[in-house]
């Protein structure tokens, strides 16, 4: 028979009483009622806030977007294969945030800031909220520094300033991404941090962009945020805000940053998908009523900060894809009204061989003029007007049989200007080279050069300046003005190249 030892029992009880933990944990918990199409309906979660992160049993995260009387609509950030009806959901009390900092440079991340390039974890402890309020009026300064794209037609006629929002708009396959990538490549040595946000793109296209940037030595100062076409709609919707948050970190440290959103059409479509699945009321083109706010709160985060705030800047280049050149559709008109100008790419110009295929007539920069350097402003003033007049004359001349000499001369110059502005992909020009090329065209110094040789002339002029007139390049780049001495050097170079071409 087992003997009972009261002393041992009492010592065990005393030990357990001594070890008793009085702390009580209270968590806001709910239950999944319904799951499908990346949306979960959750019962409970009474104290959850709009936009709050919630966590499912299997570790999947979601965002509470719809707060209804009897349930909460949650969008899932991931596949959520382990989430089922009856699973428990816990409110985290946090809003989505991403890692930020120098360690992100040269990396490819997803919209949650997790690495997807296989180079190991990102060693940074700094984080920033994905959604944050844009700087107010007092914290800003007017745009006054140029953001050189390296594309002559943009820097001469549609100049972009640091802190500006310039829309790149056009049909598919018209070179929108090419302009954005050229701009990133042109920031080499300028101490500008670039963020490229790919939304709904093919993985092969993003891999190609990474490869080009690596080849050109531009990946060292670039961060790529990728939400591919196969990702959940919630991640495609979040990606641009993640890119803005990463750039903001550097902006508030006093650095210049450039963010490219490629493209916001796909983000709007992802947001529409989420909203329709959440049973939100729909508006024009089935987009929800707050799709304008979705884009405006993103693009308002671009700013040129005041000196008191560190004088940093964030320049945004959102991309919008149009259908058959229709810029009056809902999303294009929304983003045009939010941004400080647009670069319109035409498929007709692209197919006719003019690349970059910029339609100068309807492209505009509303604030960039104040940021344009004096050197190019001085000579490019008449360029846009001449090209606009050429377009009118070219249309008119199709119906006219005999044209007077002045009209023929103007048409000839317009054609040569068009040829001069042609530029191969991934070959940005510096300021001095742009000044030289625009000067040659506007001053009529290449009117005798045959039209088919103009592209070669531009290339040879660049090579000649690099080898024989290095002082010209150095002076213009350092002084940012075209002095009389530089102008005479340029005239000599143009006449040398022209005479050697005409003699050949």
UniProtKB/Swiss-Prot annotation:
Gene3D superfamilies found in the cross-reference section: 2.40.30.20, ATP synthase alpha/beta chain, C-terminal domain (1.20.150.20), P-loop containing nucleotide triphosphate hydrolases (3.40.50.300)
Site-annotated residues for Required for activity: 363
Subcellular location: Cellular thylakoid membrane
Keywords: ATP synthesis, ATP-binding, CF(1), Hydrogen ion transport, Ion transport, Membrane, Nucleotide-binding, Thylakoid, Translocase, Transport
Positions of ATP binding: 170-177
Listed GO MF terms: ADP binding; ATP binding; proton-transporting ATP synthase activity, rotational mechanism
Bilayer topology term: Peripheral membrane protein
Parts forming coiled coils: none
EC number(s) stated in the UniProt entry for this protein: 7.1.2.2
GO CC, any one term: proton-transporting ATP synthase complex
Enzyme class of the recorded protein, top EC level: translocase
Primary location: membrane
Alphabetized InterPro entries for the sequence: ATP_synth_asu-like_sf (IPR023366), ATP_synth_asu_C (IPR000793), ATP_synth_asu_C_sf (IPR038376), ATP_synth_F1_a_nt-bd_dom (IPR033732), ATP_synth_F1_asu (IPR005294), ATPase_a/bsu_AS (IPR020003), ATPase_F1/V1/A1_a/bsu_N (IPR004100), ATPase_F1/V1/A1_a/bsu_N_sf (IPR036121)
Name of one Pfam family that matches: ATP-synt_ab
Catalysed reactions, as listed in the record: ATP + H2O + 4 H(+)(in) = ADP + phosphate + 5 H(+)(out)
HAMAP family per the UniProt record, alphabetical: ATP_synth_alpha_bact
Function: Produces ATP from ADP in the presence of a proton gradient across the membrane. The alpha chain is a regulatory subunit.
Family note: Belongs to the ATPase alpha/beta chains family.
Subunit relationships: F-type ATPases have 2 components, CF(1) - the catalytic core - and CF(0) - the membrane proton channel. CF(1) has five subunits: alpha(3), beta(3), gamma(1), delta(1), epsilon(1). CF(0) has four main subunits: a(1), b(1), b'(1) and c(9-12).
PANTHER family recorded: ATP SYNTHASE SUBUNIT ALPHA, MITOCHONDRIAL
Protein name per UniProt: ATP synthase subunit alpha
Biological source species: Prochlorococcus marinus (strain NATL1A)
